[in-house]
A protein has these predicted regions:
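Acidic/polar, glycine-rich intrinsically disordered N-terminal extensions of enzymes
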Residues: 1-136, 141-148, 173-174
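Short, structured coil/loop segments at alpha-helix boundaries
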Residues: 15-20, 157, 240, 262
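Active-site cavity-forming subdomains of large catalytic enzyme subunits
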Residues: 99, 121-259
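Conserved small/polar residues in nucleotide/adenosyl-binding loops
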Residues: 260-267
Length: 267
């Protein structure tokens, strides 16, 4: 059994011994961290409700009871280039090689909602990802790939709702119901305004489009991950490692706050 009185005395002795050494290091006022933590810091801690067991709510120890041994993480290489037909061939090769999911890279015109024949698209079509202009392109992209067997991640933000609608339409053509689909859309528009710049609409309507996507997926595509909040892009745009985390969490909180004021809050 833990002897809290003994720990208190031991902690006091420790702090007295290292006080002079610790004084050499400046403390950051915004953080009230301690130099050492003990069971005293979790005295009265409700293990079941705050930590829980692996695979059980609140999932602080993983969503699978036996971690990756129960279910391996999805293996997916970020891929997409040139035309939908060429990328489709690449996807089939990756799946045959053992990949267990798809990660779709879109070209810049697609990311900002431009057709490949638009004047602003000149020189960028198919360069950093696949060009998707229409439902026909999406059909070619996933031709021969059973969407009820493979999960798909699409790194797309501004037109995320449109690309998701196309994906659902292709699945329905395959006879796959929306509720059978599994995957992710990045759908993190706020980091586009502050880091990457591939946005289409002003912030307010863009945020509304995101919460509408949340609501639709909660009712029609329950296995779909409706957002993947990005931090890496913010760091690459010049943020420090601390700012990277801070801004990403601030963005996530903004989505949650807006969600609570929408019709999708209950879901």
């Amino acid at each position: 059994m833990t002897n809290y009185e003994e720990i208190k005395q031991g902690l006091a002795d420790y702090e007295a011994k290292v006080a002079k050494a610790n004084a050499k290091f400046p403390e950051r006022k915004e953080f009230k961290e301690k130099h050492v933590y003990t069971p005293l810091d979790v005295e009265g801690f409700d293990y079941c409700s705050k930590s829980g067991f692996p695979g059980q709510y609140p999932f602080t120890r993983g969503v699978q009871p036996t971690m990756y041994r129960g279910r391996l993480w999805t293996m997916r290489a970020y891929a997409g280039f040139a035309t939908a037909e060429e990328t489709n061939a690449r996807y089939k090769y990756l799946l045959e090689a053992g990949q267990t999911g798809l990660s779709v890279a879109m070209d810049l015109p697609t990311q900002i909602g431009l057709d490949s024949d638009a004047e602003l698209s000149h020189g960028e079509v198919g360069k950093v990802g696949v060009a998707i202009d229409s439902l026909a392109d999406m059909e070619k992209l996933f031709e021969g790939i059973p969407l009820d067997k493979v999960s798909t991640s699409m790194t797309i933000n501004g037109p995320a709702a449109v690309l998701l609608a196309m994906y659902v339409a292709v699945a329905e053509q395959q006879g796959v119901k929306p509720e059978q689909l599994k995957g992710t859309i990045q759908n993190d528009i706020l980091k586009e305004y502050i880091a990457r710049g591939t946005y289409i609409f002003p912030p307010r309507p863009s945020m509304r489009l995101i919460t509408d996507t949340f609501e639709y997926c909660s009712k029609s595509i329950p296995k779909w991950n409706t957002i993947s909040v990005g931090a890496y892009h913010i760091r690459e745009a010049g943020a420090s490692c601390v700012q990277e985390i801070a801004f990403a969490f601030a963005n996530a909180m903004a989505y949650i706050c807006l969600l609570y004021t929408s019709d999708a809050a209950d879901d």
